Amino acid sequence: MKIHKCAFCGADILPGYGIMYVKSDGTVLRFCSRKCFVSAVKYGRNPRKLAWVRKRQK
């Protein structure tokens, strides 16, 4: 089984979990939670500027 990384926060996503979003150009984005999905797709937020994101650069 393959473990994927969240496209927004970088967390590990186990098989059977998370949200898979396919853009109109065919790009596949995988998210660990609805919070990450909405932040990235709906609001277009930058993960580096949010305190709760794990892959935030300090």
UniProtKB/Swiss-Prot annotation:
UniProt keyword Nuclease, yes or no: no
Cofactor(s) the record lists: Zn(2+)
Gene: rpl24e
Binding positions for Zn(2+) per the UniProt entry: 6, 9, 32, 36
GO molecular function, one term: structural constituent of ribosome
Cofactor note: Binds 1 zinc ion per subunit.
Keyword Glycosyltransferase among record annotations: no
Any matching Pfam family: Ribosomal_L24e
Protein family: Belongs to the eukaryotic ribosomal protein eL24 family.
Organism expressing this protein natively: Pyrobaculum aerophilum (strain ATCC 51768 / DSM 7523 / JCM 9630 / CIP 104966 / NBRC 100827 / IM2)
Gene Ontology cellular component annotations, sorted alphabetically: ribonucleoprotein complex; ribosome
Summary of the function given for this chain in its UniProt record: Binds to the 23S rRNA.
InterPro entries, per the entry: L24e/L24_sf, Ribosomal_eL24, Ribosomal_eL24-rel_arc, Ribosomal_eL24-rel_N, Ribosomal_eL24_CS, TRASH_dom
Protein name stated in the entry: Large ribosomal subunit protein eL24
Known partners and oligomeric status: Part of the 50S ribosomal subunit. Forms a cluster with proteins L3 and L14.
NCBIfam families documented for this protein: PRK14891.1-1 (NF034186)
C4-type zinc finger locations on the chain: 6-36
